[in-house]
Amino acid sequence: MKIQPKSGREATEAFLQGAGDVLLSYENEALFIERQGDPVEHVTPPHTFKIENPAAVLTKSENAEKAKAFNDFLYTPQAQRLWAEAGFRPVDATVAAEFSADFLQPEKLWTIADLGGWKQVDSALFAKDVGSIAKIYDAATG
């Protein structure tokens, strides 16, 4: 069966319904299904990618002050605990220590910068017909 889920959550749901033997997904998805009691084994590889979830405030927002306050709140210990409870790795060191059992530390967290930046990664992996992942995807679905 060939499927192309549109999101991490959709991929998780398809996996739990029997599509595939292994799911490569985001850490928060693994924690979500573990916390739901689904029969899965969550593996943190020794070398993996750091995926950041940025927030932005529009410079011309009519609610710029409130938006900035909300953005600032996201990094408070209170908000970081909420993020951690939802399965997202906290960036606050104190909160990270509180949730250390949930968020194992891999030997190496690669960043896009480690791989030459988005322009290089996008070309090498996703460029139509020549990117490594594009070719694998085309072979699997073509």
Regions found by a protein language model. Give the residues of each.
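Arginine residue identity/basic-tract feature
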Residues: 6-9, 35, 50, 81, ...
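Solvent-exposed loop/turn segments at secondary-structure junctions
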Residues: 28-31, 48-49, 61-62, 88-89
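Ligand-binding pocket segment of bilobal, Venus flytrap-like solute-binding proteins
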Residues: 1-45
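Periplasmic-binding protein-like
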Residues: 5, 36-64, 68, 95-99
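Extracellular/periplasmic juxtamembrane helices and adjacent flexible linkers that interface
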Residues: 61-142
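Residue-level signal for functionally critical sites in structured catalytic/ligand-binding pockets
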Residues: 27-29, 51-54, 80
